[in-house]
Structures are given as C-alpha cells and as structure tokens.
Regions:
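Extended, non-globular alpha-helical segments
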Residues: 433-472, 523-563
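Short gly/pro/ser/thr-enriched loop/turn and capping motifs at secondary-structure boundaries
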Residues: 59-60, 64-65, 491-493, 512-516, ...
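Glycine-rich phosphate/ribose-binding loops and adjacent secondary-structure elements
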Residues: 368-370, 470-478, 482, 490-496, ...
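Conserved alpha/beta-domain cores
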Residues: 108-109, 557-560, 567-917
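Short beta->alpha connector loops at strand-helix junctions that form conserved
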Residues: 56, 486-488, 507-511, 600, ...
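Nucleotide/phosphate-binding sheet-loop regions of phosphoryl- and nucleotidyl-transfer enzymes
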Residues: 2-427, 435, 460-463, 470-472, ...
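C-terminal accessory/binding modules appended to enzymatic or scaffolding proteins
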Residues: 13, 24-32, 437-479, 850-867
Length: 917
C-alpha cells in the first residue's frame, strides 16, 4: 500500500472499538461486517440482558489498518482500546494489570463468517509476576491461578510468539507440542491420569520451566506485563487471519481474503476454579440430526478450550446428549439443575430471537452462569433439512427462509452414500465411537494430513485417523473421505468441521490405539494391527468402525426431502434438465425431479456397459473403404441407436429429450489393441496392416478442432441420416403406442448458419420419409449447441434454422480462454493461488467473457426468433454460483448430471429469491 493510502487509513475518523457488557452494548447483531459474527452476537446478547462478561470489539477495519501499517496500530486505536478497557474495568469491578485486584481478559478472533478453530484465541491475559500474588490472595486458590498461568504461557507462546512470527518448528515440534510433552512427562512421573491432579506447587514449578523452554526455543523472554500481553495478543489474532489454516479454510469455504477479522477482548470468567465451576458448548438443536432437543457437552473444572480441543471426553449436557461413551458421567441437568434451567431458558430465547439454531459457549464460575458466545450453528445436511422444515412447521420461519437455510452442497450430502446395510450386517465391528457426522465412508488408512492430500490427489479414498484433529489438519480433513479420532466429543474440532462440510466423522473412539512410528492402529475389539494403506469403513450415523471395505449405496429418499423440494420448485423460474447418456441415468434423474434431458450424447452408447457390439459396428463403419460399405455398416448400427433412443424417450415420456449427434473425432473409436484390430480385419476381409493404415489416415494434429461434430456430418451426410432415421423411427413407434415422445435434435460444434441449414434439410427429408413409411406425424425441435465464440457472435443468423440453443459452456470456456480442459490442472493452482483468476472457469462460469458471450448469444438469437429456447448443458449447469448468473440473463433451463438435479433445483430457487429482494 502506498504512503498516501496509509495516511488515509491512519487519520480517517471512524469508530474503531465497540463496547459491550452490563446488559448494554454499542453495537448489535446486524453489524457482522464490522464487528464479525462473534462481536455482533456478544453485543446482541448483552442487549438482550444476558449474563455476558464485559469487553469490547476491535473492528474488522482495524485488521486492514494493521496490515496496511505493516503490523502496527494507529494512535487512535490505542486511545480507544484504553478507554474501552477502563469501561470494562468499571463494569467488572477490577483493574487490568492491578497487583491487588487484577482483571484478566481473553482475546478472540471473530470473522463475519464463522471459521471454527481456524484463527486463534488467548485466555488469561494479564497474569504476570505483578498480578499473580494478588490473584492468589483474592481467590484463595493458588492451584487455579497457576493452572490459568500455565494455560496463558502455552497459548501465548504458540499463537503470538511462534505462529504469528512465522517461526517454523524445529524437528516438526511446535512450542505448544513441547510444552504439552513436558506436562505429560510430569503426569507420567507422578502417576496422574488427569490434569486436575497436578498440585499448586507442581504447577508453579511447571510455569517456570515453561518460560525457560520458551526462552530456549524462541529466543525471547515470555512477556511479563499485562499491557505487553494484551497488545501482543491483539496482533497475534490479526496475524492469524493470514495463517496457513485460515487461508486454507477460506479457499474451501470461498470466504474473501479482504474481509479481515475483528478482535474480541473480553473479561475472563473461570470454569477451572473447582468443582462448582465448569465450561461447555451447546446447541439449541441437535447439529447432527436436527432433532429439536437441547444438545451439548460440558467439563467440570476446565476452561473453554478443553471442550473444543477434544483432549478428554466431556460430560453430557442432559439426557438427550447421552451416548455409550458418556452415559455414566454426570449431566449438567442433574449436577447443577438451576444453572441448567437458566441455560435452557437462554437457548430458547436466543433461538426465538435469531430464528435459527444456535451454537453456544458458556462458563460456570463458582455456580454462576456466563455466556461467552452464540453463533449460527454448523450442521449436517440432514440436520439443515430437518431444522428448516421443523422451523417452518413451528411458524418460526417462512418458506423462502426455509429454502435459503439449506445450502446446495448440503443437499448433495443428503444424497451421499451410506454403507450397504446388508453388507454392514455381516461385517465385523472393530470399535464404536461418537457419531459426530453421519453417512458412510470407505477408504485406506492415513495418519497425517499430508498423506490424506496425497491419496486424494491420486484419485483415492482415505480415512484420516488422528488422536484428535487440530486446525492444522484442515486440508487433510477436506481431502479425506472420512475422519476417525481417538479423543474428543461431539463438539470437538473434528466434529464441528466435519459437520460443516457434511463429511462422515467418528470421534472419541477410545478403543483405538495409534502407533505413529510404525504407522499402525489397533482396536481392542479386533486385536489386529492395521497398517497405513489398509481399508476400513465408517458408519458416521452410528459411530461404528469396520476393518474391511464395505460397498456403499445411495441414501434412500425421505418424505422430508420430497416435501422440501416441492416447496423449492414453487420459487424457481429456471427449468432443470439432466445430462443423461443411458436409460438408467434418465430414470435416476427423473426420480430427482428432472424436467427433461438437456443432453443425450449419442456417442456414449459406444463407451462402457453393453457397448461392445455397437462399438464393433461403429468401428466397422469407420474402417470401411468406400461410402457404399460405410452405408451398409451404418444400417447394422442403426438398430442399436434406435433402441437407446427409444428406451430413453419412453422413460421421459411427455418431457423433452435433446439428442446431440455424434460429436468426437472418428479416430477416438479406432481400435488400439491387437486382438480388436485382428477381429476387425477378419470382419472386413483385409489385413491387420491395412486396418492400421486406415486408422492412421484418420489421425489429426489437433483433433478437438478437426473433423468432429457438424463437420463430420457435412463430410459424411449418411452418418447424420442414420442418426436422424433412428430418432424418428423410435419416435414414430412410441407415438403408435400412444405415448408422447418429445425429441429435440442438436447439432454440435457449429460455427455457421449454413452448416445448420445444410443439416436441417437432411433432417427434414429423413423425417418426411419416416412419416410416409409409418403414416405418423412427427413433431420435433431442431437446434444447435453454441460452444464456439463465432456461433455466439452470429447467433442472430444461427436462429434462422435453430429453434433452440444449448450453450456448451465447457468448450465455450476452452475456446474463449484458450485453456485445454484436460491440461488445465498443470497451472490452474498457480493461477488461483496468485489471484490471477478468482475461480476455476471450468467449475464456475466466467461472467466477464464466457458469460457475456452466452448473454450476447441469447439476445442475438431472440432478436431473430423471440420464442427461442435457451439452455445450458455444460458442467456449469450444476454449479450454484453459475446458476445464479444464468438466472439473470434469460436462460430457460440448465442441464446437469442426475445427482446434481436437486442441487440445481435448490440453487435456482435460491437465486430467484435472492435476486427478487
């Protein structure tokens, strides 16, 4: 940033700090962009009269200032923070840095969009040599004070002194890991099982050892004044916005880099002051299933990070939260009934206020409840659907809000596979953990994030196994098919993140023992040591682990899904068709609500299942030496084309089906193997050498821009005739059966209106022949695929012959960018990483050029033919962001793969709702 801009940033007059607490606040829940989600909700809870520890929020704009100033603070910010600190002291009756009555604070990040665990938190700021004695005197609890101090040293050295400074750990051991190891060694030497068994004197000694280790490893003293700790923490939170894991999460969730994070400085309340103190995380409804039951976990004598970190199995909040792992642990409902009742009332008040499921963090200090956070809770796709429909039924939200509550990706998750119940029934169960995120996952074992990414990169499926996950594992968690951890509860990091992504996850699988050195894992119920690379299967709905590869199957549709989709369809104007190449695809798409087929590729009958005979006939035609021989070979092929067309039209009775004529270059179908060459040679009565010679003659330097699509049909009109005859014969036969077939014929790779006119003449001639032979009137639509820029730019002329356009955005993107779709992976990562482009244009439509060509094509075509139907049949037809754009430019329908049909239906409705506001 240049100096003038820095001056503008430094001296611009604006409010940088917003105070909250004492049942009042300067901000409110609408100010997410400025205060971040956490700050806005802390302000809103304060305004609602809830017990929120006082504090203040430094705005997201200050994050931009911090980076603009090269990691510094304006004088205005320093003054505003000082004033807010005084106001906080007044409410809490304590003073920051005071030797006798010290106020301690926490420092937490808060982006406007929830990023659980991706940025950093520091607790107990203000504990130093000057305040420790006063804190001990005031609380009468030296063990609590030194436990709080050791936590500060661990967090601050990790977040501020190492990560924020960009220091790479030596030998892969971060300062936090080294301090954790020191504490574990102390427990082992003393025979302690729990942290709470460590005595006050032992904790005091440990704190001194920690500080010495910090100096040894990081080369600087641990800060020993409250002021230094506070400003170091504020900077550490700002820097964590650009930490590796935060950047990786933003890439996955598509959160803009320039949003920045707010910083929330809040008075500390303590859950680690004894048996009448606790900390917990709760959800106003079950985040895994959507059930309308209060759900959560808590830990006695602990601080907030202990629950989320998943270091020990927490207690259940109530009866609804009990499972096989925590059934014998005391619930908050029975241990502290009055506190539980107050918390239950608060969750109902919050949910009714925000009209959405709330994720709540709370602390109980010596029997008093304090609310530390509320936010819209992450949930699985199944839970999102359940909650949306339940809240609609309860009158809490309207239909449009219900539609907007389920993300398109969550619908994808609902349709995700489950383990085949029949196979699962006879499989051997290895272990059971907590069902943190539902569905089935099958994959090979990996133990590190890096290994998971490597497997996924090679197209494999893996299960990431960890003691517990940390935010550093974020990319590996994304890459894995499923996640399995030894420790942690239903609100641990692994559970929260997996639920947000709809990824199968089991946590708290305590029977599992991991040996990282040997790269093995054993399950006490099985005994066998499983090595990295071996297959296991997870049932995330029940928390079950199996030591074998179990096949998966589609989750059955439930009435809730059907009812939800019926509401969705009321609010969209875009039609949704499917790309289907087989009758099976067509039937599946129809069950998902497809309104027709936008792309049936005739050449796909020559690939895959049952393709051997038609492919042999096609090869025979290709390798014939004369047109007479080719026509004879085509007559053998025609019945196969007709059969595929007829069965598809039958399934889609009364719905349009777009048949695209043969598109690929002929050389793609030339036999490669010696035995297939020999078979073809024998069929044609020529030598293998002659077959090879004829095959070689079809070779092109640049086949994707060579003899393919319409060019093939202009060069060999009888190939087009065969396809037209098959389509019209199938149509006539179905009409005679009393059905209502609706064929639409699409010519690919066109660049000229004359190409279309040439083909239309052949098509109409063949149609007339079939009508005469069958005494049946046939109705069809004739159109073209617009996939070359010239076709889009001359669309007014193309519409003379074409009754519909279907934009093939895959090739249109290829031709516009000059990127090869097959080779784009070699550089796309660098282009995205260096922000040369914002999105992969093959996944999300490029609105600046490709999108403009589509829009220009629509306008040009309709200037000639006002009733011209326009559709999309590229991969973009199933991309929610692209659908949102298509909804604004006059597209009539999008076409996508069968499993993306529900996603496209939802995305189209959401686009219409958002754009009509």
């Amino acid at each position: 940033m240049d100096n003038n801009k820095i001056d503008d940033v430094m001296f611009e007059s604006k409010k940088r700090v917003y105070r909250f607490g004492g049942k009042q606040a300067e901000g409110d829940g609408t100010m997410r962009e400025l205060l971040g989600g956490k700050g806005a909700n802390l302000a809103e809870m304060s305004r609602l009269g809830m017990p929120v520890p006082a504090g203040f929020t430094i705005t997201t704009e200050c994050c931009a200032e911090y980076y603009a100033l090269g990691g510094g603070y304006t004088e205005e910010l320093k003054m505003d923070v000082g004033a807010a600190l005084v106001a906080t002291e007044k409410i809490m009756g304590k003073k920051f840095g005071d030797p006798e009555n010290p106020l301690l604070v926490s420092c937490r990040s808060g982006a406007r969009s929830s990023m659980p665990g991706m940025m950093d938190t520091i607790l107990n700021i203000g504990l130093c040599s000057e305040t420790l004695p006063g804190m001990i005197k005031k609380t009468g609890n030296p063990r609590f004070v030194y436990d709080s101090y050791r936590r500060l040293i661990m967090m601050y050295s990790d977040v501020v002194m190492e990560k924020a400074e960009g220091i790479e750990p030596e030998d892969g051991q971060s300062i936090r890991q080294q301090l954790d190891r020191m504490m574990a060694e102390l427990k082992e030497a003393k025979g302690y099982k729990s942290d709470t068994e460590i005595t006050a004197d032992e904790l005091k000694d440990l704190c001194e050892q920690f500080k010495a280790k910090v100096k040894e490893v990081l080369g600087v003293e641990f800060p020993d004044t409250a002021k230094d700790q506070l400003w170091g923490s504020i900077g550490g939170v700002f820097k964590s916005w650009n930490g590796k894991r935060a950047i990786a999460y933003r890439r996955i969730e598509r959160i803009p880099d320039d949003w920045g994070t707010a910083v929330n400085v809040q008075s500390m309340v303590f859950g680690n002051m004894g048996e009448d103190s606790a900390t917990g995380v709760a959800f106003s409804r079950n985040p895994a299933t959507g059930d309308n039951k209060f759900y959560g976990e808590w830990l006695i004598n602990a601080q907030g990070e202990d629950v989320v970190a998943g270091i020990r199995t927490p207690n259940p909040l109530n009866e609804a939260t009990k499972n096989d792992h925590n059934r014998n642990l005391k619930s908050l409902e029975t241990a502290m009934p009055e506190v539980y009742k107050e918390l239950d009332e608060i969750r109902l008040k919050l949910e009714n206020h925000f009209h959405d499921m709330q994720d709540i963090e709370f602390t109980i200090q010596e029997g008093k409840l304090w609310m530390l956070q509320c936010r819209i809770g992450k949930r699985t796709g199944l839970a999102a659907l359940q909650m949306a429909m339940d809240m609609l039924g309860e009158g809490m939200i309207d239909e449009k809000t219900a539609i907007m509550r389920v993300a398109p990706a969550q619908l994808d998750e609902i349709l995700h596979p489950i383990l085949n119940p029949a196979s699962e029934k006879i499989a051997t169960k290895l272990a059971q953990g907590l069902p943190a995120s539902p569905g089935g996952a099958v994959g090979t074992i990996v133990f590190t994030s890096e290994a998971a990414m490597a497997v996924a990169k090679n197209g494999g499926k893996c299960i990431l196994i960890r003691e517990e996950t940390s935010p550093e594992d974020i990319e590996g968690m994304r890459a894995a098919a499923g996640i399995l951890t030894t420790r942690g509860g239903m609100t641990s990091h692994a559970a929260l993140v997996a639920r947000g992504w709809g990824k199968c996850c089991i946590v708290g699988c305590e029977a599992m023992k991991i040996n990282l050195e040997k790269k093995t894992v054993t399950f006490s119920e099985g005994g066998k040591a499983f090595k990295e690379g071996e297959w296991i299967s997870l049932n995330g709905t029940k928390g079950l682990v199996y030591g074998e590869k179990i096949e998966t199957m589609d989750a059955s549709e439930n009435p809730l899904f059907i009812n939800f989709m019926a509401i969705v369809d009321k609010y969209r104007k875009l039609g949704i068709r499917t790309n289907a190449d087989t009758p099976e695809d067509a039937a599946k798409a129809l069950s998902f609500g497809a309104e027709g087929i936008g792309l049936f590729r005739i050449e796909h009958m020559f690939y895959g299942k049952n393709s051997e005979t038609p492919l042999a006939k096609l090869r025979k035609m290709i390798m014939c030496d004369t047109d007479k021989e080719r026509k004879a070979a085509l007559s053998e092929l025609e019945p196969f084309i007709k059969a595929a067309v007829k069965s598809t039209l039958r399934i889609m009775d009364g719905k349009p089906v777009v048949f695209r004529l043969l598109d690929p270059p002929l050389h793609e179908f030339v036999p490669k193997s010696d035995d297939k060459k020999a078979e073809l040679a024998a069929e044609l009565g020529v030598s293998v050498q002659e077959i090879e010679k004829r095959g070689e003659s079809l070779h092109e330097i640049n086949p994707m821009m060579g003899l393919r699509g319409v060019r093939l049909h202009v060069t060999y009109p009888f190939i087009a005739e065969t396809q037209y005859r098959a389509i019209f014969t199938a149509t006539a036969e179905l009409l005679k059966e009393g059905l209502n077939p609706m064929p639409e014929i699409m010519i690919p790779v066109t660049v000229s209106a004359r190409e279309l006119s040439f083909q239309k003449a052949i098509c109409d001639r063949v149609k007339a022949e079939i009508e005469g032979q069958t005494m049946t009137a046939i109705y069809y639509k004739f159109g073209t695929m617009i996939e070359i820029p010239r076709a889009a730019l001359t669309a007014d002329r193309m519409a003379r012959a074409a009754e519909f356009f279907s934009f093939g955005t895959n090739d249109l993107t290829q031709m516009t960018f000059g990127f090869s779709r097959d080779d784009v992976g070699t550089f796309m990562g660098d282009y995205l990483g260096n922000k040369i482009i914002d999105d992969d244009p093959f996944q999300t439509i490029d609105t600046k050029a490709v999108g403009r060509l589509v829009e220009f094509g629509i306008q040009g075509g309709r200037s000639r033919r006002p009733d011209l139907k326009c559709g999309i049949c590229g991969e973009h037809g199933g991309d929610p962001d692209s659908i949102s754009f298509f909804n604004t430019i006059g597209i009539d329908y999008v076409s996508c793969s069968p499993f993306r049909v529900p996603i496209a239906r939802l995305a189209a409705a959401q686009a219409e709702i958002a754009q009509s506001k």
